[in-house]
Amino acid sequence: MDQPAHAPLRLWVTRARPGAEATAARLVSMGHRPLISPLLAIRRLRPRLDLTGVGALAFTSRNGVAAFAALNPERALPVFAVGDATAETARQARFRDVRSAAGDVAALAALIIAEPVEGAVLMAGAREPAGDLPGALEAAGVQTRPAMVYAAFAASGGRGLTALRAGKLDGVLIHSPRAARRLTGAVGGGGLAHRSSA
């Protein structure tokens, strides 16, 4: 039997559920050993969504798509998605007209600006968004309507922190700036640098 080209890495997946499971499955398929221990937890909010005057939807994450889809049956409005994974989530939720910026918030803003929308762009996203999509769009004269459909809350990450402190990890996967801040706050900047250099 052939030996693997490399030893499996022990990797802490800090991503919130349910995305953490997909990341872990991919790591397993690559021969690694993931440890799921989220630093953030996603909670859907229940805002009243008024789509009057809305000409398109914008999503900066898969969580935004899932939360909006659970709140509202609208699927005919054009959807602008930050990346391919978010676009695929929108298609799976039965949105009919989905376009991917295949990038970041700046790329998403550029895509929306390049394809004029009649009416406002409703941005269904996090209570504390990572980027300033409304600012970029409004600077270009695009009407925006933010809708906070989910929030990320701190989770303990206890199992991951314990494994990190015990030197039982080869790496840590961080999926957002907020999770990175949470991790450095939990272990201290110097402690993280020391452990990650091992």
Residue ranges of model-derived segments:
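Signature of uroporphyrinogen-III synthase
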Residues: 1-198
